[in-house]
């Protein structure tokens, strides 16, 4: 099965600090929630099949046949420098499909790939950073976000066919994730 992906901005960060998120760099139509187009089905692929220009090819949803891709911006329209956290939370996993899932983040052009540690060796997968926890794929802090700054994110999610954990056992599986942008990090007690 495919996947669903949304991005939400913490109300306090939006209201108190005048932080906005948007997917169109021209219109800059600020929202509190953004949503990538869903994929009905996602087959496993190699990272090498993802276009090299994925970070610059489009804004908003620009999914491929077997991956979710979404580009958006965060802008500080306030008068104070702030720090913010961004986290990608794993909402639901069916048939252990998270064992082969990859989350690639381009943050202002810098690429990082996150993956669950190998189930057999308990080591990070090749050229990846391990998921932060069982329920959080990514947790990072952006410091010194000054007035007028704009951060660009491109998020890409796929199932890595070259992952040793990508077996027939995950066929028909599903994964749902969402991203939160907030002023303070709060431990999730789920």
Give the label of every model feature segment:
Residues 83-97:
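Short acidic, flexible loop segments centered on an aromatic residue
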Residues 1-51, 61, 175, 184-190:
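Short, polar/proline-rich extracytoplasmic segments that appear immediately after membrane translocation
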Residues 53-82, 89, 133-190:
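C-terminal, structured domain-capping segment
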Residues 5-37, 94-135:
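A surface/secretory-pathway sequence property marking extracellular, secreted
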Residues 42, 104, 177-179:
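Detector for methionine-enriched segments
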Residues 2, 98-100, 172-176:
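Short edge beta-strand segments in beta-sheet-rich domains
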């Amino acid at each position: 099965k495919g996947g669903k992906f949304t991005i939400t901005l913490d109300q306090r960060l939006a209201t108190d600090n005048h932080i906005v998120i948007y997917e169109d760099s021209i219109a800059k139509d600020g929202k509190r929630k953004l949503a990538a187009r869903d994929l009905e089905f996602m087959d496993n692929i190699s990272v090498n099949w993802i276009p090299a220009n994925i970070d610059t090819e489009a804004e908003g949803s620009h999914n491929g046949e077997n991956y979710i891709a979404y580009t958006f911006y965060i802008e500080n329209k306030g008068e104070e420098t702030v720090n913010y956290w961004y986290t990608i939370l794993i909402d639901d996993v069916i048939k252990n499909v998270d064992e082969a899932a990859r989350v690639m983040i381009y943050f202002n052009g810098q690429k990082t790939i996150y993956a669950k540690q190998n189930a057999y060796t308990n080591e990070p997968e090749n050229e990846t950073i391990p998921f932060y926890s069982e329920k959080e794929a990514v947790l990072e802090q952006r410091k010194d976000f000054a007035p007028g700054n704009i951060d660009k994110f491109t998020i890409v999610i796929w199932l890595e066919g070259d992952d040793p954990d990508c077996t027939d056992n995950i066929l028909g599986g599903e994964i749902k994730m969402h991203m939160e942008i907030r002023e303070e990090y709060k431990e999730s007690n789920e």
